[in-house]
Amino acid sequence: ANQFSPPTLTKTWFHQGMVGDEGEVQDEAERVSQYWSGDPPLLEQESPIKESLDRLEQPAKRDALRALRGSVLRTELFALDGSERETRPYTVTESRYELWEFDEPGEGDGERPRIFYPHVTATRTTQWERGNDPMTQFALTRYTNQAGEFDAFGRPLVQTTIACPRGWRATTDRPVEAYLSTSSKT
């Protein structure tokens, strides 16, 4: 028996780093307009990064944005099978990042670039399976302890996964069923 699997289309949006000479970041609204309209973004991607960048001088801002360049912001997976559901994705995933600077340059370091560590603090995965009743999960990750210090190896200290109940679509929804959550500490 012949087995056939239709081709798939994966759309992936990456952080562009610095666009332009003045340290501008790609406009989030421009990026969001390209997303599948049935699944608006639920994770604020720009605010945590913007807060980090606002404290930096231009050369350091360039180094921070260089560290973020190429980070995956969102992925959508479709099947190109010619059916009426071809425009509905199987899965939508989005991620939110924060920046951590370590080993700031000292007085004897001259003009060396600053070193930033971009890390994922939240991920949302919605499994549409081309239907109308998606399953949504969030994964929240904390890398710092109460004193704001990172693990010596950059490992997450706390990871929490939340599965949203059926019928849940937005953060303002109040579903009848309970959320399911697991948390682990290292």
Model-derived regions, located:
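Non-catalytic interaction/targeting regions
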Residues: 1-186
